[in-house]
């Protein structure tokens, strides 16, 4: 009998707790949506029907409110729908939203102290130190290495095509291979050929990052929504295989370079400068990384590994998706494809018939195509911040309290006709001099403000190389009927459900 009473009491307490939790936004005076106990806005994610980003997109489309309360399982969060308010959160009022609110533990887990995760003064100090890594001069110095990976991409495609006629290739997988190699060479300085060796160390790490099994789902959810839980997992020694493999690879490479005085023009070399000299040299011609006289290291090997892992994971998925989605859209828009091909041809011709960094920089129409792809298919479909001090919402009586997670649906804003006329149409002209028929505050594929993606310029260069190589060496078959890409239901990045099919043939 006592057991029954205890059970009734437990159920009653649970009911009261859930009702109290899921009435949070009502008590704060905010409009709300996605009030589905116990998973809130993520109910479709738990049922395997939608990815995290697309579930938030559904919430975005369900209302016209400028800011709306929702529930990420048991955690209340705010979805910002108004473009100007989103811009203020990221830029003008950055002081009130300067952190992401995700898991980071610099002291006990240095691998977590990546530029993406770090907070406050630690983040600002590291950001300032890393900024010189991505200047035009540094990227130009790395270009020859990147270009050689583009040649391997061309060779791989050639081998798969018949001597006559076209063949359908799945571009997402192909461009993922290209992305892995270009990241491995420009970041780690390692000569990797995943086209010839699909089981190399970087490919293995990539597969472990993208497993989408129950372990990864739990760890990803805890890192994003419940940082305290992730700290507990780390404390009890629950290691993530991909992270550990990256740590080992990074440490081996650092030791090899420092012990043998090896100098290469890549991102790791710049991090070694920072480790050994306390700063990255702003002279684009100096790449050496000798230690200072006192031998003090300003950056641990684990901290270096954390940055490399971030740049690897972020750069790999963004490059692969943006490249494949752009080529897919070109096959659906023949006029756009002809302009892009001419842009590539004329830029290469202008620079002596070679694909150089300067030629890439001159491809303005191709740049506009990439910007339009990043709008329609943002690699990360959402941005997140956390309120770091109480913030009165402009033109309202609402106050966002410190500690509140903030979500901005990029795919929501980017496909909102209020901000982008005819949002599903692929129009690179939006970004050319006579375009600009869109709300600029709503265009956020690389983020905005002080925490804007630090590697955006490098990413665009890598995407341009791949597209320029493909357009210069192959013919792409125009699709007879336009077809929108369906997205997968796992992970946060925007992933195609069934790949990105494009028919190619050898250039006549």
From Swiss-Prot:
Named cofactor requirement(s): heme
Enzymatic class: oxidoreductase
EC number: 1.14.-.-
InterPro entries to which the protein is assigned, alphabetical: Cyt_P450, Cyt_P450_CS, Cyt_P450_E_grp-I, Cyt_P450_sf, Insect_CytP450_Detox
SUPFAM superfamilies tied to this protein: Cytochrome P450
Keyword Iron: yes
Coiled-coil regions listed: none
Keyword Iron attributed: yes
Domain of life: Eukaryota
Subcellular location, record wording: Endoplasmic reticulum membrane; Microsome membrane
Keywords from the named record: Endoplasmic reticulum, Heme, Iron, Membrane, Metal-binding, Microsome, Monooxygenase, Oxidoreductase
Main subcellular location of this protein, as a coarse class: endoplasmic reticulum
Bilayer topology annotation: Peripheral membrane protein
One GO MF term attached to the UniProt entry: oxidoreductase activity, acting on paired donors, with incorporation or reduction of molecular oxygen
Residues binding heme: 453
A GO cellular component entry from the record: endoplasmic reticulum membrane
Stored PANTHER family: CYTOCHROME P450, CYTOCHROME P450 310A1-RELATED
Biological function: May be involved in the metabolism of insect hormones and in the breakdown of synthetic insecticides.
Family to which this protein belongs: Belongs to the cytochrome P450 family.
Descriptive protein name: Probable cytochrome P450 6d5
Provenance organism: Drosophila melanogaster (Fruit fly)
């Amino acid at each position: 009998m006592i057991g029954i009473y205890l059970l009734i009491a437990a159920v009653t307490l649970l009911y009261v707790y859930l009702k109290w939790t899921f009435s949070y936004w009502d008590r704060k005076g905010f409009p709300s949506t996605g009030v589905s106990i116990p998973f809130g806005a993520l109910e479709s994610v738990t049922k395997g029907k939608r990815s995290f980003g697309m579930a938030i997109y559904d919430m975005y489309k369900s209302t016209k409110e400028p800011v709306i309360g929702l529930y990420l399982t048991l955690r209340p969060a705010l979805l910002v729908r108004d473009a100007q308010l989103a811009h203020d959160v990221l830029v003008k009022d950055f002081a009130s939203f300067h952190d992401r609110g995700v898991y980071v533990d610099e002291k006990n887990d240095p691998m977590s102290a990546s530029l993406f995760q770090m907070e406050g003064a630690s983040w600002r100090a590291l950001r300032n130190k890393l900024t010189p890594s991505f200047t035009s001069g540094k990227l130009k110095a790395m270009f020859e290495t990147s270009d050689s990976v583009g040649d391997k991409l061309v060779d791989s495609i050639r081998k798969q095509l018949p001597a006559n006629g076209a063949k359908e290739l799945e571009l997402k997988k192909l461009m993922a291979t290209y992305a892995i190699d270009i990241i491995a060479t420009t970041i780690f300085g390692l000569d990797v050929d995943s086209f010839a060796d699909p089981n190399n160390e970087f490919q293995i790490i990539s597969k472990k990052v993208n497993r989408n099994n129950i372990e990864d789902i739990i760890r990803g959810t805890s890192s994003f929504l419940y940082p305290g839980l992730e700290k507990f997992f780390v404390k009890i020694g629950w290691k993530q295989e991909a992270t550990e493999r990256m740590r080992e690879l990074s440490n081996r490479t650092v030791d090899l370079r420092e012990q043998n005085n090896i100098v290469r023009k890549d991102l790791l070399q710049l991090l070694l400068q920072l480790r050994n000299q306390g700063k990255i040299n702003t002279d684009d011609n100096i790449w050496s990384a000798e230690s200072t006289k006192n031998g003090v290291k300003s950056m641990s090997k684990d901290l270096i590994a954390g940055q490399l892992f971030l740049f690897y994971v972020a750069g790999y998925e963004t490059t692969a998706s943006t490249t494949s989605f752009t080529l897919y859209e070109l096959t659906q828009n023949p006029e756009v494809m002809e302009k892009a091909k001419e842009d590539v041809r004329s830029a290469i011709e202008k620079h002596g018939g070679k694909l150089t960094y300067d030629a890439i920089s001159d491809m303005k129409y191709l740049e506009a195509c990439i910007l339009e792809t990043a709008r329609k298919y943002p690699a990360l479909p959402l941005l997140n911040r956390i309120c770091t001090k109480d913030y009165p919402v402009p033109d309202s009586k609402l106050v966002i309290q410190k500690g509140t997670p903030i979500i901005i649906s990029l795919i929501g804003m980017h496909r909102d006709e209020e901000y982008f006329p005819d949002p599903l149409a692929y129009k690179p002209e939006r970004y050319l001099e006579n375009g600009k028929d869109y709300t600029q505050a709503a265009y956020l594929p690389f983020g905005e403000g002080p925490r804007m993606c630090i590697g955006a310029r490098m990413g665009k260069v890598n995407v341009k190389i791949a597209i320029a190589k493909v357009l210069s060496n192959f013919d792409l078959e125009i699709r007879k009927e336009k077809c929108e890409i369906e997205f997968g239901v796992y992970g946060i990045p925007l992933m195609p459900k069934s790949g990105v099919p494009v028919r190619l043939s050898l250039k006549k």
